[in-house]
Amino acid sequence: LPYFDKTNRFASIVSPQYEMPKNNSEAGWRSGRVRQQLSNKETPIDMRMKALLALQNMPARHSAGILRDTLSDGSDDLRLLAYGMLDSREKQLTHRIQDALQRYEKLPTAEERYVPTRELAELYWELVYQNLVQGDMRQFSLEQVQRYANEALKYKAKDAGLWAISGRMWTLRGDYIRAMGGFTTAIKQGFPLVR
């Protein structure tokens, strides 16, 4: 008969305490309901404005499309608010990109440049991932992801996260063979399969 190891390999933990969510006035707004409220021209403008403001609490990836749709709305107030929200999110990332570029340019060696180079690849990816750029700017951002990811991977080839970003970038650019290579390498370097 086979030998069974009877040692306990699992640790016991205390169950977490459940806390009721705080009563948030925007908690009931979901992207589907917001889109419905904004697209219904018969909804009073104050309700449509509340729906638009509820998007501030949603991730940019989910709300950018709704905000872009609102840019063609008949109400000037809604259009201006949607534009301001999109512009604010894009400016936050652009400011972080400028900071990382300044740090990148000040450092003389590839070893020292690794951290800002990786950060630049991630930040340009965020512009694309959050749907904050379109058209030529999206294409430019994907090129910058490729440039900085490749540069960072030359110094630290075992960076699983960068390989995954590279795979996603190649997928969006339509090069599925390179994308598969990026994902395969990311998994080999320890990137979790569930992400």
Task: Show the residue positions of the predicted features.
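Amphipathic alpha-helical scaffolding segments comprising HEAT/armadillo-like alpha-solenoid repeats
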Residues: 28-38, 60-71, 94-102, 163-164, ...
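Start-of-helix register in tetratricopeptide repeats
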Residues: 46, 115, 161, 178, ...
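Structural detector for internal amphipathic alpha-helices that build alpha-solenoid repeat scaffolds
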Residues: 14-26, 47-58, 69, 80-91, ...
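Amphipathic alpha-helical repeat scaffolds of TPR domains
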Residues: 76, 80-83, 87, 91, ...
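Short coil turns that delineate tetratricopeptide repeat
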Residues: 42, 111, 154-158, 188-191
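N-terminal alpha-helical membrane-insertion module
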Residues: 1-21
